[in-house]
Amino acid sequence: MARKSLIQREKKRQKLEMKYHLIRRSSKKEISKVALLSDKWEFYGKLQSPPRNSAPTRLHRRCFLTGRPRANYRDFGLSGHILREMVQACLLPGATRSSW
């Protein structure tokens, strides 16, 4: 189980990313439109002005049961070992263990 402070930090990052999403998108569009290098540098400065935690690359998908940030399956929203346990216990309909 991940510490609750890490999960709260991730939620805070998600809120910041949603808040500054339009600012980042508009400045990226302006950078691609402008031809002069000096004007591009102005927009690069605007792109760097939002907080670092508002960048979408700083977000992690977390397992919604344990909060584990690694080995997540997007389809289920679970980490690998929790997914395996749930499939073994027949808690996920349609999911079967592979055997050969």
UniProtKB/Swiss-Prot annotation:
Single GO molecular function: rRNA binding
Function (record text): Binds 16S rRNA, required for the assembly of 30S particles.
Subcellular location: Plastid, Chloroplast
Organism the protein comes from: Ipomoea purpurea
Subunit text: Part of the 30S ribosomal subunit.
Keyword line: Chloroplast, Plastid, Ribonucleoprotein, Ribosomal protein, RNA-binding, rRNA-binding
Pfam families assigned: Ribosomal_S14
Gene name per UniProt: rps14
Protein name: Small ribosomal subunit protein uS14c
PROSITE patterns: RIBOSOMAL_S14
Family: Belongs to the universal ribosomal protein uS14 family.
Principal subcellular localization: plastid
InterPro entries in alphabetical order: Ribosomal_uS14 (IPR001209), Ribosomal_uS14_bac/plastid (IPR023036), Ribosomal_uS14_CS (IPR018271)
UniProt GO BP: translation
GO cellular component: chloroplast; small ribosomal subunit
